[in-house]
């Protein structure tokens, strides 16, 4: 037996690669991933060890001894110890949690620092992960109450439908089953995306009925070693990102096609950035290896240098498969790698109940009326089901598979065409099955009314109104899409923007490219709630219209200094102002007056500065602080005033404090809000050098 990859050894042992990796870790065998090699000797040792473990597991276990009274009592005590507490979102404070779990604050602070290395202070507002660590330390379960919507109008009907599946995924994990992966092929123009899709389709799809296929539905399914893979056959990262922007992720895996004779090109980088933003696994297919000038090693080097993708054989974690879509060389291995990645990522679905699907194409057909091509995500879609989708509803009149053959049911990851919608549904949105056509109609009508009312107020992030969103996060993040006239300009922009990074704010460049601002850039910005900055480039008309429609902020500049200045101003506006205390005056209590129904009033001689009715005061007695708080009333003679300046006398009533004495010293101060400026990387390094 020659050396094997981990996933090949897993097959021999009838295990999943993930299970084998866990077993190897427990055995102390150091392997990086499922693509790592294991030599023959090591493979035999692993097989022997795991087979021995299996034999032991199958042996009947010895009968357990009956528990003694002490053991039973101990178990009862342990069970009693386990508590469950419910917290509201506004109760994530150390003092509240300490009270709820019955552990003193100081004890929690000490335990968390010593045992978990987490520094806390009394009354601190906690992050959710800090709360979880505290409760884990004391073996207490937690449940966070969800904040209720304040009005029916705020509830998105489709969000409620989507939530139904999220709850199923959380509460019924044991019912989830693996489903075939859905794959999107991306890459630079002329690198062979369509040729690859045609090759897979022609060699893997079952023979057609006589007359051939008359209509493509936008996706097809193939079978590989008894397992299915669904391919979306409308390649292009614009479609892929538009789905994400509409909250309808269909793709599980991206195959990035790069030509071996051309290397990494601008659209390759753009496609990669779209896939990366979606956080889906990427497999690289180096195509055209049959060409005389093909250079696979050089292409791999460009993957590292331009995309940061390190092939597994070079010690990285990116699967790279050399192929020829024209001859078919390497295509079978690519399909096997897709199945392997699907298995490693545990792509699952909820197979029962009402179906959920995503629309990949839709149109008005002259003969069939409104039609939609969908990929089923969960459940079973059936003829006769009532459905809703974005702007319309209907009843499934007919279903056609990817060969345009009529079927009665469609299963997860299966591509099908639906007939029966009242209108053409929005492409790239989700489809949900509901209990009846009447209910479907009601949902869509309510949603359309609410969307119309919100139309004017709905918009994406722009440089002026980031404040609200940013205050919700400790680390503030601004996503940027950069377009410039040359790669030199792109490099200069990146360099200038990186100097604006700070501890308080992170500038995340999602994509940077050369050329005019396109619809693809706008859809990416909409998907990541980002801002587009263009340098010496124009915005094409389609992109301009789409940006207005999606509410995406697009800015263009001809001077780099102006771009940087605008960005600086926006970043400064994202920081909350700092509160600074300013002492404004001092005084002394010369006389104490007792007034019925009012209490004690201090007769004060101002020594310097002034006293402000809207400010604060500290009272010192023999050098010790006895009170700090607000001024309830301030009088000059009998007149209510806002300010009294030295050397005048005045009468002061302190809010909630009457224990005053002659000779008490007063210090008056105000709290001012001072505009904060971020400490940019360049300024920080200058300060460190000084």
From Swiss-Prot:
Major place of residence: cytoplasm
Keywords: Cytoplasm, GTP-binding, Initiation factor, Nucleotide-binding, Protein biosynthesis
UniProt key word Ribonucleoprotein: no
Recorded superkingdom: Bacteria
Molecular function GO terms recorded: GTP binding; GTPase activity; translation initiation factor activity
Keyword Cell division assigned: no
Region of interest called G2, as start-end residue ranges on this chain: 212-216
Region called G5, residue ranges: 324-326
PROSITE patterns: G_TR_2 (PS51722)
GO terms under cellular component: cytosol
Chain positions covered by the region annotation G3: 233-236
Pfam families: EF-G_D2, GTP_EFTU, IF-2, IF2_N
All copies of domain tr-type G, residue ranges: 178-346
UniProt xrefs under InterPro entries: EF-G-like_DII, IF2_II, IF2_N, P-loop_NTPase, Small_GTP-bd, T_Tr_GTP-bd_dom, TF_IF2_bacterial-like, TIF_IF2
Span list, region G1: 187-194
Region described as G4: spans on this chain: 287-290
Family: Belongs to the TRAFAC class translation factor GTPase superfamily. Classic translation factor GTPase family. IF-2 subfamily.
Job of this protein: One of the essential components for the initiation of protein synthesis. Protects formylmethionyl-tRNA from spontaneous hydrolysis and promotes its binding to the 30S ribosomal subunits. Also involved in the hydrolysis of GTP during the formation of the 70S ribosomal complex.
Protein name: Translation initiation factor IF-2
Species for this entry: Thermotoga sp. (strain RQ2)
Gene: infB
């Amino acid at each position: 037996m020659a050396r094997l990859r981990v996933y090949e050894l897993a097959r021999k042992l009838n295990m999943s690669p993930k299970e084998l990796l866990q077993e190897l870790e427990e055995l102390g065998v150091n392997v990086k991933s499922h693509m790592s090699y294991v030599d023959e000797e090591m493979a035999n040792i692993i097989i022997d060890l795991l087979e021995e473990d299996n034999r032991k597991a199958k042996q009947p276990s010895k009968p357990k001894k009956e528990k003694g009274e002490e053991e039973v009592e101990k178990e009862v005590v342990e069970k009693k110890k386990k508590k469950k507490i419910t917290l509201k979102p506004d109760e994530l404070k150390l003092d509240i949690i300490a009270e709820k779990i019955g552990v003193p604050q100081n004890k929690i602070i000490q335990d968390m620092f010593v045992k978990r290395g987490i520094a806390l202070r009394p009354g601190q507002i906690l992050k959710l992960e800090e709360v979880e660590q505290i409760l884990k330390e004391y073996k207490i379960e937690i449940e966070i109450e969800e904040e209720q919507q304040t009005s029916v109008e705020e509830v998105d009907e489709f969000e409620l439908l989507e939530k139904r599946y999220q709850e199923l995924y959380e509460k019924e994990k044991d019912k989830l089953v693996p489903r075939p992966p859905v794959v999107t092929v991306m890459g630079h123009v002329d690198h062979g995306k369509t040729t690859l899709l045609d090759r897979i389709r022609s060699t893997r799809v079952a023979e057609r009925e006589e007359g051939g296929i008359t209509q493509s539905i936008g996706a097809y399914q193939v079978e590989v070693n008894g397992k299915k893979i669904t391919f979306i056959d409308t390649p292009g990262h614009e479609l892929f990102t538009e789905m994400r922007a509409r909250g309808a992720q269909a793709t599980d895996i991206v195959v990035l096609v790069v030509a071996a004779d051309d290397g990494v090109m601008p659209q390759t980088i753009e496609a990669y950035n779209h896939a990366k933003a979606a956080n889906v696994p990427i497999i690289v297919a180096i195509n055209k290896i049959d060409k005389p000038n093909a250079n696979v090693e050089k292409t791999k080097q460009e993957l590292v240098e331009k995309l940061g993708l390190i092939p597994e054989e070079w010690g990285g974690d990116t699967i790279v498969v050399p192929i020829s879509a024209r001859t078919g060389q390497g295509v079978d291995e690519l399909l096997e790698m897709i199945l392997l990645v699907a298995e490693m990522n545990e792509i699952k679905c909820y197979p029962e109940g009402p179906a959920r699907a995503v629309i990949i194409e839709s149109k008005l057909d002259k003969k069939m009326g409104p039609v939609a091509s969908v990929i089923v995500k969960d459940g079973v879609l059936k003829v006769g089901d009532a459905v809703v989708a974005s702007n319309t509803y209907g009843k499934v009149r007919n279903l056609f598979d990817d060969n345009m053959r009529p079927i009665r049911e469609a299963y997860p990851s299966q591509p099908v065409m639906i007939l029966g919608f009242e209108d053409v549904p929005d492409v790239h949105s989700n489809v949900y099955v509901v209990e009846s056509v009447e209910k479907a109609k009601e949902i869509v009508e309510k949603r359309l009314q609410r969307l119309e009312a919100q139309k004017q107020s709905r918009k994406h992030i722009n440089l002026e109104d980031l404040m609200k969103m940013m205050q919700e996060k400790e680390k503030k993040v601004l996503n940027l899409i950069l377009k410039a006239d040359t790669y030199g300009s792109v490099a200069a922009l990146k360099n200038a923007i990186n100097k604006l990074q700070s501890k308080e704010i992170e500038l995340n460049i999602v994509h940077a490219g050369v050329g005019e601002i396109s619809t693809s850039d706008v859809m990416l910005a909409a998907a990541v709630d980002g801002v587009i900055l263009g340098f010496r480039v124009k915005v094409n008309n389609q992109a301009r219209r789409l940006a207005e429609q999606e509410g995406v902020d697009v800015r263009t500049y001809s001077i780099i200094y102006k771009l940087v200045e605008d960005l600086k101003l926006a970043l400064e506006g994202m920081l909350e102002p700092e509160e600074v205390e300013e002492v404004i005056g001092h005084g002394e209590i010369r006389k104490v007056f007792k007034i019925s129904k009012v209490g004690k009033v201090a007769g004060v001689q101002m020594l310097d500065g002034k006293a402000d009715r809207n400010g604060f005061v500290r009272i010192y007695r023999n050098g010790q602080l006895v009170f700090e708080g607000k001024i309830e009333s301030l009088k000059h003679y009998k007149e209510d005033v806002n300010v009294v300046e030295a050397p005048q006398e005045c009468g002061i009533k302190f809010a909630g404090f009457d224990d005053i004495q002659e000779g008490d010293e007063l210090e008056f101060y105000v709290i001012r809000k001072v505009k904060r400026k971020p400490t940019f990387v360049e300024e920080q390094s200058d300060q460190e050098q000084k």
